[in-house]
């Protein structure tokens, strides 16, 4: 550790504490006078431009000479919810819980368990000091930082005292909450904004309205310079799906946001995650200077901290399983633990040594003869620390701080929690949202295009309707669609805000903007954007032939606009008050169907049942529909169409003896008043027009406020922070071990498996390897086309890796490490690749990818698979068919044993926080690839995000695999010296994908060091070789390259020797590629692939009961809504209308069904595309067919529930042929809805676009179902579409089935009355008419007031829709054909959008 002496700090790292009489450690005398000088010495080592940049930033920010305040915490204890290990939920367990069949009390009490996370933490952090928090994942580091940041609402209970500047944290958070900031490990940003826009928003929000635009821009420039982002300011931030800056640069954006707050207490959770060692060191240097100049307090956890980083910290806190085992000067920590009997090897970094005190006992090195004297458990460590003089000094410092706070109290001046007033926040949020909308192609181009298409189709379908009674229903349908399309758009948008929740909460913590400001900013943007959205519907208005006056048009526009706003706010509020998207789908689906049903068209107000009619008063869609109908009909009269005249035909010419058989008409009148029709048919009133506009405006305001309030009350869900789910019940051993650990991590559950210890398992190389393999590459170049021309990512690279070799692939940020790894593994799909790839001297064929293992940086797994199931699936699908299944499973058990995963073999992978921890997930990722028994194993950043001990555990595992004969290539970012020495060879890249070294590392990296020392400075004693290599070639944003390392390597003797050796490893020109061992690209036949993937998909559905229960309850809710609305419909004229629309309403559940189906399909697709596809695990058809096959049983079951609750209560035929036909058609419809949803999901790039597309296609299908737009009155240009409209065949079949042979009668209000000529009976006068009429006379012998009932039976009623009973059975086959077409398109669209390259 001599290298560390070059950086003196308070409490020098080589300081040796004295041993007190009681056997505890006593620190050497220190008067504390060197505190300021130590800080000066540290900052003096920084480059002057950085110090100047910070100083300049503070000057612009007007923070000269801030009043520094310290932090004091005493006896802090934290409890969180969680049960450690428990059985995974399934559909059966959810059913038992829902219906209370078995132990209902158990489920109610399941969430009441609490576990200690932190116990009795105490300490002080003075102003200008930096605290390093060390502990393995799961020990409580994140919890401690969140507790300092007063994020207490995430936990069940927090005890103890925490003060800032002598004031209780509660008081500080009330008066100055902006002084505390917590930067999480995740990077949450708006991906379509640029880096400059992201930082400008944060700085503008924290500086307040006083800062000018010039000052804000200057601060943005200075901050970008500090964190090394100056070159990417105009690049999108991006995310996993949107291309933007690199992962390391995105991390620096997050850190820059945290610094922009200029808080007095800055807590950073693993801030160097994703940064290479040089960039990480630069950031810590920046934080040292920032902390010293601002006199703030900085606390951070850092995993895999190098020795170069450690001196910049003043104090260190070591946590073991939620207990404080050391707190003091960082220079005293090493000696303290050495005095306890532990040993720190020369090659072990101080960070890793301290971190081992948090790990399991097996990974700690103990001095000879002290094995039984050292503490082992966290309780023992805590007891030893409490008995030491370090703890006594800590207690004295606490008392001193208390006395100082009492004697010299510092006034706590209350300041605004947010620098910007609320109205300014709303304005900036609205502007930001406008930028997001305009930068997202799908929002400003795709969505308007779909709306315009909808409007044009509907407008031409209802084009130029005449002012006649025959067009009354057509006008009503067109007006209904004008309010329905915005409703569909609003429903499709409900899920857009879930992804932004972590970002909104982060900006609330940073006091950048209030969540309510974000919500109202969205509202402000909507107010503008929805105007444009409604404008796209204008073709519908004018093409249909609505009243073309300015007053009527703008009234219509205002009505639809306010309805769109109100519904958008409503569905957004539902989403905000729902914990996640899956839970939100249920209320959204039920409310959407209720709104559509109670619009007033499907069931007019006079026909509504008394027990549900009140629902219309809660329905913005009802108010909008009534208003647009009144707006259109109020001043018009409609000529009675010949088909509506009773009687009509030859000999019936005197209107005095005729009547218009339409509700609202009067005997002897040739025209019908529009308002009379509305009042009689729908119960609408003229005076309701502007009243309804006002009500919808009130709905908009109310729901907007609800969304704002709901957003303001958003909290990070505490959840069950430490739950690992097992198949069945977890073993007692696992539960006990987990309970004893007592530690919980916010993001990662505690380690329930044992750590890798030494060489616990021996890997037999010869027994498990078929042969030795050598992968060689020569002249590799990769070029891509950009807007600025051709860009080379890889530049003439040569190299090889052999069986038994562990090769480290390193380089500066952006050097192309992952690109090279993808290229070697055959996974690169971009640009033009040239050069040669060979295995054992033969060219690589395409099939060889299935025999290579590739462990991605992201651990992508299906959450519901157990560890053993995940490995067994890979073994079954990627190992040759000729190998017996028993042998494959036996090999999986060996892999599980090698990776020390026996204890978690039956655990579900889960998600972070409710599943395996980060290291366990990484082991599973490695195990999945090892189960395929690959010839070459590639790993991309396997230690990223891990603590030092976990990283070493993973690398040591790789070392053992290499010793067993496995060839391994591994990229690595921040390797400690101990990690680097585990590798055999180093492959080092510089910027531009150029090679600067390829060769052996040697013992303690001496061979590689010797090469670099020939052309650069000498490697310091104890210096990390990896950092030395990267520093030499100019890694980091502030380094300048001092030599042409690419040229030096090409001219070196080592390079020439490697080139000569490579010639024997590459094929001669014209040599044939390696002969495939099998004909197929896949190891097993397709039917085996399909069976295995279906099994996995079935378990995915079975073990996530939320989906099945949501699907079931949506069916129950919508069926009851439909059946209770049309309960026992009578055999009247309106009863026939109700029977038709009840059947039609059963088809409206399609879009909500899509909301449930599509996320499942997308999840399965993404797992295949991002992990399983590249390894030829199984054919893409297998996952598509599996998604279809497994979905169908759930579809059949829930549609059966819907049909039973709907069909019989409405009063349809109960004969087996009729009921059976209806049941069959509804089951087919449910399958059709599933197929359409999956087709849209396969077509669209993301789930939001899939939601919108599903609504779009369903609107088309429903439009041409023949009910709202009857075929006989459809313009001839559109009649052809009924032949290709699937729901027309369904609607025809169901309608004729429920109406055929149904005798109809007339209620009193439905009778049309006309007067016969004097002296003529009604029967005599209407005899000729009745021969061709669809209705009948009620009083044929009367001489006056002839009563005519328009329809005599069901078939006479459905003829108006162009339906025919003879088509009933042929429609079944046709509809099945449409279903087959949809599923075929699922295959085609999946291939075109995700498979074809």
Swiss-Prot record:
**Any idea where this protein resides?**
Vacuole membrane; Cell membrane
Which CDD domains would you find in this protein's record?
ABCG_PDR_domain1, ABCG_PDR_domain2
Write out the transmembrane intervals: 442-462, 472-492, 516-536, 551-571, 584-604, 692-712, 1135-1155, 1181-1201, 1223-1243, 1249-1269, 1372-1392
Q: Name one GO cellular component term.
A: plasma membrane
Recorded GO MF terms:
ABC-type transporter activity; ATP binding; ATP hydrolysis activity
Q: Where does this protein chiefly localize?
A: membrane
Name the membrane topology term.
Multi-pass membrane protein
Q: How is it used?
A: Patulin was originally used as an antibiotic and specifically trialed to be used against the common cold, but it is no longer used for that purpose since it has been shown to induce immunological, neurological and gastrointestinal effects. Genotoxic effects of patulin with dose-dependent increase in DNA strand breaks in brain, liver and kidneys have been detected in mice. However, more recently, it has been proposed that patulin might also have anti-tumor properties.
**Entry protein name:** ABC transporter patM
User: In the record, what lineage is assigned to the organism producing the protein?
Assistant: Eukaryota, Fungi, Dikarya, Ascomycota, Pezizomycotina
Q: Which gene encodes it?
A: patM
